[in-house]
């Protein structure tokens, strides 16, 4: 039986506490941007955020864990089954799944966006080109905007907090920036998230990118994506009044988008070789400033 303390914060002794602790440790190591941002949320609500973000990380890294699409499909189907089984299904042994299902129950989270996130990640398993810019924005919405929206529901403790349009723009800006940061790894394993319509406009093919010979066309294509990310940032800023203070920690990691974009515009940036990151101090400073301004 879940104790009251465990129900609130996931901190009581027992399997659920261990599951939430696993999520926090995983996030601290694998996704420090979201982890540090989550520390600005009320302490009792952080475990729910950690469960959501750890789930997103687990699903996102399926491609890295398999060498063929079929085993990846099996792993994603396992997550679908976990979500569809809910409380009525057998208790999963996976700590992230345990924490996620408890978070869904405690905060009455809808299953559809979680399932949609899993479904969107099927694209990652294959080396198909991203067909168009609208397709890329849709992918970003399902994998990133939906996650922000779910985090808002946790922070609002299951009530509708508003801010859905803001979450949409925030998620797209964050996802586009993340994909550009991951460009070296994606290109090395044959994945191209730059939309085919943008590549065609700049005279680049998928084959050019995976063979490391994109040239100026790749630079122009990435420049277009940076401009698009900033458009979504501006739209988010225009909608800031629609975001209640209680749910702003869900948006906090988006404060790191502009520093990342600026790092990509520095002299010497090479999309195939440059690793775009922030020092822990720079990350803390950017998030602290954004939290104070919220």
Where are these predicted regions, by residue range?
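Catalytic cores of Mg2+-dependent Asp-rich isoprenoid enzymes
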Residues: 2-101, 110-121, 140-149, 160-175, ...
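Cofactor-binding active-site loop characterized by glycine-rich and histidine/acidic residues
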Residues: 107
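Acidic/His metal-coordination segments adjacent to aromatic residues that form catalytic metal sites
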Residues: 122-135, 212-214
């Amino acid at each position: 039986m879940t104790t009251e303390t465990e129900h609130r914060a996931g901190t009581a002794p027992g399997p659920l506490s261990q599951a939430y602790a696993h999520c926090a440790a995983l996030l601290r190591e694998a996704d420090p941007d979201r982890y540090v941002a989550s520390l600005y949320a009320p302490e009792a609500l952080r475990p729910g955020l950690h469960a959501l973000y750890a789930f997103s990380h687990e699903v996102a890294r399926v491609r890295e864990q398999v060498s063929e699409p079929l085993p990846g499909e099996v792993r994603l189907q396992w997550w679908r089954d976990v979500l569809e089984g809910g409380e009525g299904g057998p208790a999963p042994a996976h700590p992230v799944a345990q924490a996620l299902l408890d978070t869904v129950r405690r905060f009455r989270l809808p299953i559809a966006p979680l399932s949609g996130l899993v479904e969107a990640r099927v694209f990652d398993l294959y080396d198909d080109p991203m067909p168009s810019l609208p397709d890329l924005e849709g992918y970003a919405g399902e994998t990133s905007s939906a996650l922000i929206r779910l985090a808002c529901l946790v922070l609002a403790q299951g009530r509708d907090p508003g801010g859905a349009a803001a979450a949409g723009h925030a998620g797209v800006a964050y996802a586009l920036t993340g994909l550009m940061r991951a460009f070296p790894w994606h290109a090395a394993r044959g994945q191209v998230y730059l939309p085919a319509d943008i590549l065609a406009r700049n005279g680049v093919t998928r084959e050019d990118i995976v063979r490391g010979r994109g040239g100026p066309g790749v630079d122009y294509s990435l420049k277009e994506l940076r401009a698009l990310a900033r458009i979504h940032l501006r739209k988010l800023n225009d909608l800031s009044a629609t975001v209640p203070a209680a749910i702003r920690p869900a948006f906090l990691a988006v404060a790191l988008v502009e520093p990342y974009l600026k790092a990509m515009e520095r002299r010497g940036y090479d999309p195939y070789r440059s690793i775009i990151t922030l020092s822990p101090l720079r990350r803390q400073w950017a998030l602290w400033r954004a939290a104070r301004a919220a």
